[in-house]
Amino acid sequence: MEELNIKQILFLAIFLVIGVVLFQPIISYVNNVTTSGTYTTIISGTLTQTSFVSNPNYVGSSNAPLVSLVPLFYLIVLIVVPAVVAYKIYKD
């Protein structure tokens, strides 16, 4: 019984560490694929030129709202799984 709790606590710690470490790269990637592009301004003397540079990784306007929810669901899983494991440990 004690060894089972140690395994569960170890799983919980590893899960949280990996989850927290991967959270920022996931947010960065989602921001990358949901941004259609950027505006670039070039100033040469008195001439100002603005151009739009499209993002080749853009998922499209219809998919962007769904993809932008990925970090939210990831955060929910990161909260719910440890809560369930902690409840099972507490219950035993």
From Swiss-Prot:
Family: Belongs to the fuselloviridae capsid protein VP1/VP3 family.
GO CC field: membrane; viral capsid; virion membrane
Protein name (record): Structural protein VP3
Compartments, record wording: Virion membrane
Keyword list, A-Z: Capsid protein, Membrane, Transmembrane, Transmembrane helix, Virion
Bilayer topology annotation: Multi-pass membrane protein
Main location (coarse class): virion
GO terms assigned for molecular function: structural molecule activity
Ribonucleoprotein recorded as keyword: no
TM ranges: 8-28, 65-85
Organism per entry: Sulfolobus virus-like particle SSV2
